[in-house]
C-alpha cells in the first residue's frame, strides 16, 4: 500500500511538475522513471533507498549515462 502511494506521488510529479521544468537529468532512464520502476520492482523501503541514491548522484559534476534499475532478487 505504501509502495503504491509512493509510485502515485512520482507519477503526479511526472505529469504535473516535470513538464514545467527544463530537462536536467543526466541519466537514462530519468530519475523519476528510475524511482517509479525501483519502487514497483523492489517495494517501498529498498525502492526508496535506490531512488534516493540515484538522486544524490544526479548533479552537474557526475557524468551520468545509462543506469538501469537492478533486477529484483525474488
UniProtKB/Swiss-Prot annotation:
The entry's keywords: Cell inner membrane, Cell membrane, Membrane
Coiled coil: none
Cellular-component GO terms for this entry: plasma membrane
Pfam families in UniProt: YidD (PF01809)
Subcellular location: Cell inner membrane
Topology of this chain in the membrane: Peripheral membrane protein
UniProt superkingdom: Bacteria
Family matches, as InterPro entries: Membr_insert_effic_factor_YidD
Main location: membrane
HAMAP family per record: UPF0161_YidD
Role summary: Could be involved in insertion of integral membrane proteins into the membrane.
Family statement: Belongs to the UPF0161 family.
Protein name in the entry: Putative membrane protein insertion efficiency factor
Source organism: Anaeromyxobacter sp. (strain Fw109-5)
Amino acid at each position: 500500500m505504501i509502495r503504491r502511494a509512493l509510485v502515485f506521488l512520482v507519477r503526479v510529479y511526472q505529469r504535473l511538475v516535470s513538464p514545467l521544468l527544463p530537462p536536467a537529468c543526466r541519466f537514462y532512464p530519468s530519475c523519476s522513471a528510475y524511482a517509479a520502476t525501483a519502487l514497483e520492482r523492489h517495494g517501498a523501503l529498498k525502492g526508496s533507498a535506490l531512488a534516493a541514491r540515484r538522486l544524490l548522484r544526479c548533479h552537474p559534476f557526475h557524468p551520468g549515462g545509462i543506469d538501469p534499475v537492478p533486477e529484483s532478487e525474488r
